[in-house]
Amino acid sequence: MLLGLVGSEMCIRDSIHRGKSSNVGNELQAMLQALKHRGPDSTGYALYADNDGENFIMRFKVGENVGEGSSSVNEDESVYDKRKELVDDMLKNLGAKVLKEEKLTPYSYRYEMKYDDDLMDFSKKIESIESVEILSIGKSLELIKDLGDAKVVLDRYDLGKVTGTHAIGHARMATESGVDIKSAHPFWGYPFSDVSVVHNGQLTNYWNNRRVLENKGMRFMSECDSELIAVYLAEKMRNGATLEAVSYTH
């Protein structure tokens, strides 16, 4: 399920098809590219794709991009390869079965896998590896974000062929945090599968609310205030609330 929270709609676009599938990758790219002047720093796609619904799709990164070119990295690629090997070892230890893996850039991967246990424990252990961040886990959701405009990101990750029922995306101009992948939108509702959040606006009392959630054991990966929404939702859902109930809380 996707959730868009907006102060205005200048940086967010979405596509929804009821009862049918469409090329949501290209549709979202066309809309987001028109917003390039609003958000030139990074672009993110949350695509609810036509996967088989049986297996999890995990998108993760082992480092950061430092420029629009997919080969622009801030560490030697051998470091990334080593982290990927550590992820593979951890997956074996956790009992996850990887059915398919794709290397998308020097720092990002897409895995199709079977896993039947607790996703929070799973995610914590994967992210205990230095500089590894899970961008999303879902049976439908695939969350892709990187530096560059919508077309740059679409081409880099070959999203033009992705079909699905709905999608939401964000073109970002960094104002409250750094220009990097971890601060880009959308944010995954860690560790709940198929939940993503995109937001436009500014949150007050970010640091106070962040400390409250961190004291409850919740995880933050960036200093972007919008991530707080995803973490807040996850904390409520962890304690038994439904996404629908939390979404309509005032």
Which residues are covered by each model-predicted region?
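Single conserved hydrophobic/aromatic residue that forms the stacking wall/gate
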Residues: 1-7, 12, 250
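Extreme N-terminus nucleophile/cap motif
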Residues: 8-75, 104-112, 117-143
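Flexible loop/turn segments at secondary-structure boundaries
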Residues: 22, 52-54, 175-178, 204-206, ...
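Conserved mixed alpha/beta core segments that line enzyme active sites in large multi-domain catalysts
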Residues: 31, 141-196, 240-248
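Conserved beta-strand-loop-short alpha-helix elements that form
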Residues: 39, 193-209
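Short acidic, glycine/serine/threonine-rich loops at helix termini
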Residues: 57-58, 178-182, 207-211, 234
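Short amphipathic alpha-helix segments
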Residues: 76-96
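Short histidine
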Residues: 204-248
